[in-house]
């Protein structure tokens, strides 16, 4: 009927259009079904609800994506900041100063206008207190053998790292050197890194520490102070303890330079022995008043420069104060002070280090004097500071030589030596053997007689 009305050709076109329309409608239905499954069409499935939920879905997706991008950006920035600012896993790029920011402002100097500085409460009966303690604690004798006092070697460094990149490495070498000597000679060692009194910084920091250790360790007969820039270079030399039986303070120095000339370098306080006694506590009390930093130390420095021979103008230091104290009050203190010049309790590095090869060729360790110095002290090098009084390269090379000079005496016990005094590398000095106890200990350091315990030996 329709074909007759519109014609055969148009009828076929209409049929084709209807077939295509069915396919289009079918695709549309399938699309809606898929969208309803993925996006959702609400509880009722109405067109209005479909449109509303589609709109909410895309709004939620956009809203959720924005904070995600923010988090990604913040995370990226944080990672970048950690890697760049703090160094991440790299010690090389990490700013070490962040770890050493002081917890608070430095302690302010107290007003000393009317009251002199004191190291602590006045003690007047220390000899009696100590004697009673030793009687009550016989297992901690102050002498470990006849003429062999119990000795505590004390040294230390600042709480913070050195101000130059290699300073801490040389501090490590220095303490290793001291540990070696103390182990061989049966000496206890204490390494300090705490500033016990902020007023007594710098040269003077040792005084509060020394007093505290004397009072805390009554079993110690002698305290041996040694600066961190001093090294043992004669590992064999044993101090002549018998020589000091009537003395309480032993320092490297010369009577004429201290008492007659009042020369500020007439003695050295970088390495000295102090007996644990009431006399020593009184000396520390008399020594300390020039130490507080600030105006007191500055004014005291002017007095010392005026009174002592050849002293430059700078704030009061512990060495100049000791020279001044002994020179002006010799009757009170001089009788118990031994100024040692028979060996190098302190040896100035500038006149010693270049002669090490000559010493090796002509002498052996055990003298402690100019032939083989007990201590080589690098005065003025200041290996932990920013600036020294001598060229840095010269100081560091000479410190390496001094360390190796002493270290060779340790290594020889085990059959090794440094290839040269300037070399870190070592070489064997003897062949290995299946009878190691037959190996020769050239300097007698493996089992020195002064370390032998008076005990019976049992074997199983």
Curated annotation (Swiss-Prot):
Catalysed transformations (reactions): Transfers an alpha-D-xylosyl residue from UDP-D-xylose to a glucose residue in xyloglucan, forming an alpha-(1->6)-D-xylosyl-D-glucose linkage
Ranges in the topological domain labelled Lumenal: 41-460
Please tell me, according to the UniProt entry, what happens when changing residue 319 to A.
Answer: Reduces activity 30-fold
Gene Ontology terms, MF aspect: metal ion binding; UDP-xylosyltransferase activity; xyloglucan 6-xylosyltransferase activity
Annotated residues for binding of substrate: 346, 382, 389-390
What EC numbers are recorded for this enzyme?
A: 2.4.2.39
User: What note does UniProt attach to the cofactor annotation?
Assistant: Binds 1 Mn(2+) ion per subunit.
Which residues face the membrane's Cytoplasmic side? 1-20
Entry-listed glycosylation sites: 431
What is the superkingdom listed in this entry's lineage? Eukaryota
Gene3D superfamilies to which the protein is assigned, alphabetical? Spore Coat Polysaccharide Biosynthesis Protein SpsA, Chain A
Q: Which Pfam families match?
A: Glyco_transf_34 (PF05637)
Mark the transmembrane ranges.
21-40
Q: Name one GO cellular component term.
A: Golgi membrane
Q: Which GO terms describe its biological process?
A: polysaccharide biosynthetic process; protein glycosylation; xyloglucan metabolic process
Q: Its function?
A: Xylosyltransferase specific to UDP-D-xylose that accepts both cellopentaose and cellohexaose as substrates, with a better use of cellohexaose, to produce xyloglucan. Adds preferentially the first xylosyl residue to the fourth glucosyl residue from the reducing end of both acceptors. Transfer one xylose mainly to the second glucose residue from the non-reducing end. The acceptor should have a minimum of four glucose residues.
Q: How the protein assembles, per its UniProt entry?
A: Forms homodimer. Interacts with XXT2.
Q: Which family does it belong to?
A: Belongs to the glycosyltransferase 34 family.
Q: What is this protein called?
A: Xyloglucan 6-xylosyltransferase 1
Gene that encodes it = XXT1
């Amino acid at each position: 009927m329709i074909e007759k009305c519109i014609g055969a050709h148009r009828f076929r076109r209409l049929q084709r259009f209807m077939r295509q329309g069915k396919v289009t409608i079918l695709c549309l239905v399938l699309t809606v079904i898929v969208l309803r499954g993925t996006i959702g069409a609400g509880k009722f499935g109405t067109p209005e609800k479909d449109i509303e939920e589609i709109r909410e879905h895309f709004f939620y997706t956009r809203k959720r994506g924005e904070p995600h991008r923010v988090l990604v950006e913040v995370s990226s920035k944080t990672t970048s900041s950690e890697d760049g600012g703090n160094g991440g896993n790299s010690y090389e790029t990490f700013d070490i100063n962040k770890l050493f920011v002081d917890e608070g402002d430095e302690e302010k100097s107290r007003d000393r206008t009317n009251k002199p500085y004191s190291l602590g409460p006045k003690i007047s009966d220390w000899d009696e207190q100590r004697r009673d303690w030793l009687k009550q604690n016989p297992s901690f004798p102050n002498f470990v053998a006849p003429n062999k006092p119990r000795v505590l070697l004390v040294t230390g460094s600042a709480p913070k790292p050195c101000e130059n990149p290699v300073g801490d490495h040389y501090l490590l070498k220095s303490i290793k050197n001291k540990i070696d000597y103390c182990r061989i000679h049966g000496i206890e060692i204490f390494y300090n890194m705490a500033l016990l009194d902020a007023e007594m910084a710098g040269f003077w920091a040792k005084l509060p520490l020394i007093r505290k250790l004397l009072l805390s360790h009554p079993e110690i007969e002698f305290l041996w102070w040694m600066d961190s820039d001093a090294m043992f270079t004669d590992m064999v030399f044993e101090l002549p303890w018998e020589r000091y039986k009537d003395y309480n303070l032993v320092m490297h120095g010369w009577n004429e330079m201290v008492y007659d000339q009042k020369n500020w370098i007439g003695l050295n306080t970088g390495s000295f022995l102090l007996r644990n006694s009431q006399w020593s506590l009184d000396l520390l009390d008399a020594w300390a008043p020039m130490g507080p930093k600030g105006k007191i130390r500055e004014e005291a420095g002017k007095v010392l420069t005026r009174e002592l021979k050849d002293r430059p103008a700078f704030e009061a230091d512990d060495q100049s104060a000791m020279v001044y104290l002994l020179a002006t009050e010799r009757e009170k203190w001089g009788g118990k002070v031994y100024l040692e010049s028979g060996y190098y309790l302190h040896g100035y590095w500038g006149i010693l280090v270049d002669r090490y090869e000559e010493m090796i060729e002509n002498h052996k360790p055990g003298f402690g004097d100019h032939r083989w110095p007990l201590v080589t002290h690098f005065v003025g090098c200041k290996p932990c500071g920013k600036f020294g009084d001598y060229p840095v390269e010269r100081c560091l090379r000479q410190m390496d030589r001094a360390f190796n000079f002493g270290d060779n005496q340790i290594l020889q016990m085990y059959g090794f030596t440094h290839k040269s005094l300037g070399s870190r590398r070592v070489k064997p000095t003897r062949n290995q053997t299946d009878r190691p106890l037959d190996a020769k200990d050239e300097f007698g350091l493996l089992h020195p007689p002064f370390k032998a315990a008076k005990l019976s030996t049992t074997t199983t």
